[in-house]
UniProtKB/Swiss-Prot annotation:
The active site is at 50, 96 (proton acceptor). Keywords: ATP-binding, Cytoplasm, Ligase, Magnesium, Metal-binding, Nucleotide-binding, Purine biosynthesis. One of its GO terms (cellular component) is cytoplasm. Pathway: Purine metabolism; IMP biosynthesis via de novo pathway; 5-amino-1-(5-phospho-D-ribosyl)imidazole from N(2)-formyl-N(1)-(5-phospho-D-ribosyl)glycinamide: step 1/2. Mg(2+) 1 binds at residues 94, 533. Part of the phosphoribosylformylglycinamidine synthase complex involved in the purines biosynthetic pathway. Catalyzes the ATP-dependent conversion of formylglycinamide ribonucleotide (FGAR) and glutamine to yield formylglycinamidine ribonucleotide (FGAM) and glutamate. The FGAM synthase complex is composed of three subunits. PurQ produces an ammonia molecule by converting glutamine to glutamate. PurL transfers the ammonia molecule to FGAR to form FGAM in an ATP-dependent manner. One of its GO terms (biological process) is 'de novo' IMP biosynthetic process. The gene is purL. This is Phosphoribosylformylglycinamidine synthase subunit PurL. Belongs to the FGAMS family. PANTHER family: PHOSPHORIBOSYLFORMYLGLYCINAMIDINE SYNTHASE SUBUNIT PURL. It catalyses: N(2)-formyl-N(1)-(5-phospho-beta-D-ribosyl)glycinamide + L-glutamine + ATP + H2O = 2-formamido-N(1)-(5-O-phospho-beta-D-ribosyl)acetamidine + L-glutamate + ADP + phosphate + H(+).
Amino acid sequence: MTLSNTIQITPELIAAHGLKPDEYQRILDLIGREPSFTELGIFSAMWNEHCSYKSSKKWLRTLPTKGPRVIQGPGENAGVVDIDDGDCVVFKMESHNHPSYIEPYQGAATGVGGILRDVFTMGARPIAAMNALRFGEPDHPKTRHLVSGVVAGVGGYGNSFGVPTVGGEVEFDARYNGNILVNAFAAGLAKSNAIFLSEAKGVGLPVVYLGAKTGRDGVGGATMASAEFDESIEEKRPTVQVGDPFTEKCLLEACLELMQTGAVIAIQDMGAAGLTCSAVEMGAKGDLGIELDLDKVPVREEQMTAYEMMLSESQERMLMVLQPEKEAVAKAIFVKWGLDFAIVGKTTDDLRFRVIHQGEEVANLPIKDLGDQAPEYDRPWREADKRAALPANLVAAPEDYGQTLLSLVGSANQSSRRWVYEQYDTLIQGNSLQLPGGDAGVVRVEGHPTKALAFSSDVTPRYVEADPFEGGKQAVAECWRNITATGAEPLAATDNLNFGNPEKPEIMGQLVGAIKGIGEACRALDFPIVSGNVSLYNETNGVGILPTPTIAGVGLLPDWQAMARIGSASEGDRIIMIGVDGSHLGSSIYLRDILGSTDGPAPEVDLFAERRNGDFVRSAIRNGQVTACHDISSGGLGLALAEMAMASGKGLNIDLGECKGLSHALLFGEDQARYVIAVPADVADFVCINAESAGVPFRRLGTVEGDALAIDGLLSVSVQQLRQAHESWFPAFMDGSALAAAE
């Protein structure tokens, strides 16, 4: 069989499609001929890192993905976890890094749109969103432009679609100067017996195109997302998709309405690689072939080629395998919502992916080799060198503890993110119980009197760089801890693994180490990974990002009225630290932001202590013994106390007399498995007795009183001063005054 080729397939063209010479040879061996230009594009899209996970698949298989509550693990559009009463939560996190650097508004907006589609494709109504954003250093000339565009894009799409943004992260570091990260998370609610999957079943059934029309936007987007950046980056702007949240809202309602009719056999959103990836995945999963007739595809631009139509990443589109007898019902629903509905193909029994355009066959390929049998690499990797220990007595103590604390709470990475989250609608749908700014976002489960879900997103990239294994463990542990700090039971997680070029053994070593750490922590904490995304080649001119394996998790609150908040302490409450005294200053923000050093190892994560301490805190919260709770993470005990004081507006009188160690390590050490809790005075003794009997280390620290954070003669800073420092950096940065002052 030979397909006509109007474009010569040259080594340069092959390389431009991101295919290595040995991969192209594999294509020749598979199909026994030269591929057509359209086929080359299809292979390029399906065999790149973004779609095939060819560098990471071996290691992803080692992650724990099952558990008593897991209904659907990795391999579908999103993970599904049981939350009792016949309900389930559907969630996933995914990156849109490269597009957001090139075109920040549309890149971020379509990142939100794509993750929302992943959720409602499964039959779930989205109820919460988060985003983890990482930008270059604040004084880099592009950073403010990128922050402004990304935040506007996230808010513009999410707000218009109608989903509350309940949490996330914003971090600045020079290593993201040329390659920002935009990791978008969404969660939705569905009935456990009404989950829709992408696996096609049945021969000769109609393949239906749903949603918006196809244009040229995003052609080659998946291939771009699997490449490094260089000076030609601006030329890649046409590969960024354009989103329309109002069309997506109509698509959501039409899909959920259609799903009630029994018409849907399989459904897949069109994301990376568009029509190509969705059709191949549906067929390959079901051991079926797919035939597409591109003349039936709704288009919004004239004279589109087969190549452009197959690789377009136009947004707000779905592909579905339909019960034939339900065609009229299905079409009526989509017409009602003002959306396209077109039968563009059929399922076949020959395991071929066949594409017809203008009456000619432009692609005829083995579907399994495009999908789940794509190339897989066992890349060489090198373990990171262990950093030398950094005892606290070798780290300089601050001359002025109060000024040091003010500097930390007002720094680029620890200051309030209010400027960001106030641009997001956090209250739409009317179920938000905890908003951004605390440990986790909390959303009430619609239709249930007491049940709620908690959401958190976490990673500490400087730890992962220092020690990928411990950093991977810590990302999971902090997510688990933040969910626990509300009183919720952590159920499951999704991972978004952002790394540099995996062809470099040291970068591949970071990825391998982090996955090993994530796996160990997930197993120890019964916190399985049920969905996720890998984003590699995050490099510009050979400079890689900080390794950033973001972990987003979901927890269940059986009764949200027994929930803890960071800022709900009452006057006279006693402050207790759960966990060991601070001692670890290696890779800390005190070391980085105050002393200008990145030395030292990451803190070790004792997963047994993490589990024991967290279970104790959760139990105390659910028993009504805790009025406020906050996890201790970056900045140590000092920053955690400051954040609690700012959130409540009340002072804290703290005595470190019982603590053992150097004052700066006690305050700023970033030892793990720790919380600060506020408890009523009349139950403080009871809580401490319970902790002692459970083998949980604790320290009585002081009392909620006054209007200042006063620590043991070391510092006394008014809550007003703390808030002023905490709230002022971001607005000043965005209006330019912070940079002007720094100059």
